């Protein structure tokens, strides 16, 4: 799966499970290409989510919700993910 397909899939899954006002996903893989731990086909992503629903939870609870929704994709395609909740 290429990164653009992955981003569309992640947005779709999050929107189906959480009421959000806005979501932006950035590919930060280029920052890690020369690292020893870099694996081709595994991406470094930054998720910025504006959600009144997620703001009701503390940071750990909100992050767990996102991780649970994206569990399969994290295991297969994501090396690291940074989650920003606004």
Language model features: what each stretch is:
Residues 1-86:
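N-terminal, polar/charged subdomain of small-to-medium soluble alpha/beta proteins
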């Amino acid at each position: 799966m290429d990164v653009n397909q992955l981003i569309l899939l992640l947005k779709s899954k999050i929107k189906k499970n959480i009421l959000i006002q806005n979501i932006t996903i950035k590919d930060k893989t280029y920052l890690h290409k020369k690292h020893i731990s870099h694996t081709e086909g595994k991406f470094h992503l930054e998720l910025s989510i504006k959600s009144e629903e997620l703001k009701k939870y503390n940071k750990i609870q909100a992050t767990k919700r996102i991780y649970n929704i994206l569990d399969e994709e994290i295991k297969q395609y994501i090396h690291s993910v940074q989650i920003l909740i606004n």
